[in-house]
Every structure is written in structure tokens, then in C-alpha cells.
Amino acid sequence: MPKVGIAAQAGRTRVRRAWLTALMMTAVMIGAVACGSGRGPAPIKVIADKGTPFADLLVPKLTASVTDGAVGVTVDAPVSVTAADGVLAAVTMVNDNGRPVAGRLSPDGLRWSTTEQLGYNRRYTLNATALGLGGAATRQLTFQTSSPAHLTMPYVMPGDGEVVGVGEPVAIRFDENIADRGAAEKAIKITTNPPVEGAFYWLNNREVRWRPEHFWKPGTAVDVAVNTYGVDLGEGMFGEDNVQTHFTIGDEVIATADDNTKILTVRVNGEVVKSMPTSMGKDSTPTANGIYIVGSRYKHIIMDSSTYGVPVNSPNGYRTDVDWATQISYSGVFVHSAPWSVGAQGHTNTSHGCLNVSPSNAQWFYDHVKRGDIVEVVNTVGGTLPGIDGLGDWNIPWDQWRAGNAKA
């Protein structure tokens, strides 16, 4: 057993011994004054058989965070019981199946609190006993937890243990629309080492992002705790569970695609490690400028324009088998192998918006980038990748991002 636990247990033992010693000494003194005989100390009084008025003042008092018969008790906070003018001698709590609920007694013996989540729509019974100089107090109460009409589950990216790029935001996606965005944000705790200032921004009614003002520093450790269980998220929607994740920021990998040169240049920690010719979107379907975040990677994928609203049989439609595809936008932009356009790469833009590269370069890119790395596209005739694309977060100005849109 850890030394800390032993010390805490020893502390509680000393507190109880002190109270019990005081109880015995008081009982002896009261017996000696009242009887003046040698028959030994009088028995400790209990509430039902109180002795002197002085003892009435020292009867322990029990206070609970819930009331007997309560219905709709929230489950986002511990249930607790506290003793005054005495110490807790025994506390038990069980659910409607008789299963004990875990709890912890404070070192001073004055407070007991649950340490596990309570279930929705469950009935619980709490029994507590306290000892004081004036006797013992007991209390039993039964209550029922809330029964939400709707539940929503949060999902967090990056995954636990991942090493990601300097541009990776924290992403929390719910499986239902969130009416009270502010309540959701308050339930999310993000801790970084070293400390970094960041802010929330909602891409839509279900997904909120958190990022710093500038790209992460390599080596930064990030812990995310989404504590939405039991939290009212508006319009009868409550959190279904809590979720935690820990991830680390890896090397800085930034690729720049310049339409003036039609070259994709990859830098790792500021040093150029690879340059490759590319063919980007033709004038009728130009590649948008801006900062893209690397998402998923596929050794093989079927690209279908209908997945982002362009029918396959339309002039700009397509359905094509593609190898070594690295996603950089939710709107369908990839860095991928395009053997059919090798002759145009470095000279002419021929694609529907993707960054076409040779098969060997596409495989190299696939092998050397990771989720959260950055691709910046510059000098095209296109507009700017929308910040709410899903992988375009860094295109939203920091002042706008920091101001947030929880009330939108």
C-alpha cells in the first residue's frame, strides 16, 4: 500500500481515537459528578437517550448534499455527507440493486463523498452514523437520480497516445446537436505542458475545436478531459459519458505548394527535405489558397466527386481509383499519386483541385507526414480554404477564433 494512503489512514485513526478518548473521559466525569460512587463510567448516551442539557449541545449533526425522497438528482457532482460536533463512524451507499457505491472519507473524518459516477435514473440509499461527545447520530435517506430525455456521446481527436503535427487542433465531436455550447465548453478541460493559451471555436452545432494562436511547439504534451457526463447541454440533452485523451506534438512538418513554381516543398523543423513537382487545380476548379491540416491517409481510395456535391456525370465530375492519397481538406483535396499527369506536373495545372504528384513522390509524402502536419497553398487563382472546412482551422483569424462563437 502506498505511504500516502497509510498516512491518511493513520490520520483518520488518530482523529477517531481522540474522539473516543474524549467520549470516555466526558462519560467518566459526568458519572463521577452525578453519582460520586465507584461503579465506573456511565454508558455513552445516544440521541434517543440523551443525558444532560450540556450533552444536547454536543450531539453530532449529519448534513447531506441530497435530501430524503429527492427525485431528479444530478449526476455531475459527488454525493456527500458531513458531520458536525463529531466524526463519521460509518457511511454506506447502495444502488437499487444493492451494489455498494465507492466513496472516500476525508482525513479529518468529517466528510464522506462518492468517488464513482452515479447512474442515470437510479435509486440510491445512503446510511451514515456519526459519534460525538453527546452521543451518536444516524441518518438514512433515499433519492433518485435524473432521467434525461436525450443523451449525447462526445468523441475526441487526436486519439490517446498519438503523436501529431504542429497544426493539429483538439476536436470534440458530439453525436447530437448541442444547444448550450457554453455549457459544453465549460465541461472541457485542456492542459498543456508547457502551458499554452488557446480558445474554442465551433465548426457546426456538433463539433467544437480548440487551438493555440500559433502552431504548437514540438514536444508539447496535451491532456484533454471532456467531463460532460451529467451536464445539461440544453434542450433536454445531457452528456452520456466522460472522455479523456493524451497526445504529443511531434516534429514540425510544413509543406508549401507554390503555384508560381508548381513545386511542393517539404520542410522538417525548418529544413528542406524534399521538393516535388505538382499539378494543382485548373482554372475552372482551382485549388484554394490557405493553410491545410493533414488528416487521414490512404494507400488506395476511390475518389468520387459526388461525395462533395458534384455529380459524377457532370463536366467536372469524376470517379477515379487513386493510390497514396493524403487528405488535406474535408472538401476533397488530397495530395495523391497521379501517373496520368506526370508530364504536366511542375508546368501546368490539370486537376480538379487536388495536388497531383508522381507515384514515387506520393508514396514518399504518405510515408513522411502525419495527422496534424501542415500544407500551405499559395499564389493560386482560387479563393481561400474556409476555416470551417474541417481541416482549415488556421484560416480563421486569431481574434475571431479567440472571441469564440458559443452564442452563435
UniProtKB/Swiss-Prot annotation:
GO biological process, one term: cell wall organization
InterPro entries xref list: Big_10, LD-transpeptidase, LD_TPept_cat_dom, Transpep_catalytic_dom
GO (cellular component) term, any one: plasma membrane
Active site: 336, 354
Residues annotated as signal peptide: 1-34
CDD domains found in the cross-reference section: LDT_IgD_like, LDT_IgD_like_2, YkuD_like
Domain L,D-TPase catalytic: 253-378
EC number: 2.3.2.-
Alphabetically ordered keywords of this record: Acyltransferase, Calcium, Cell membrane, Cell shape, Cell wall biogenesis/degradation, Lipoprotein, Membrane, Metal-binding, Palmitate, Peptidoglycan synthesis, Signal, Transferase
Annotated S-S bridges: none
Positions that bind substrate: 318, 331-332, 356
Lipidation sites (N-palmitoyl cysteine): 35
First-listed, main subcellular location of the protein, grouped into a coarse class: membrane
Pathway as given in its UniProt record: Cell wall biogenesis; peptidoglycan biosynthesis
Activity: how regulated: Is irreversibly inactivated by the beta-lactams carbapenems via the formation of a covalent adduct resulting from acylation of the catalytic Cys; imipenem is the most efficient drug for in vitro LdtMt2 inactivation.
Subcellular location(s) of the protein: Cell membrane
Lipid-modified residues, S-diacylglycerol cysteine kind: 35
Site (Binds to carbapenem drug (covalent)): 354
PROSITE patterns: LD_TPASE, PROKAR_LIPOPROTEIN
Membrane topology value: Lipid-anchor
Described function: Generates 3->3 cross-links in peptidoglycan, catalyzing the cleavage of the mDap(3)-D-Ala(4) bond of a tetrapeptide donor stem and the formation of a bond between the carbonyl of mDap(3) of the donor stem and the side chain of mDap(3) of the acceptor stem. Is specific for donor substrates containing a stem tetrapeptide since it cannot use pentapeptide stems.
Further remarks about this protein from its record: The peptidoglycan structure of stationary-phase M.tuberculosis is atypical since it contains a majority (80%) of 3->3 cross-links synthesized by L,D-transpeptidases that predominate over the 4->3 cross-links formed by the D,D-transpeptidase activity of classical penicillin-binding proteins. In fact, 3-3 cross-linkages predominate throughout all growth phases and the ratio of 4-3/3-3 linkages does not vary significantly under any growth condition.
Domain notes per entry: Consists of two tandem immunoglobulin-like Big_5 domains in the N-terminal region (residues 56-145 and 150-250), followed by a L,D-transpeptidase catalytic domain (residues 251-378) and a C-terminal tail (residues 379-408).
UniProt protein name: L,D-transpeptidase 2
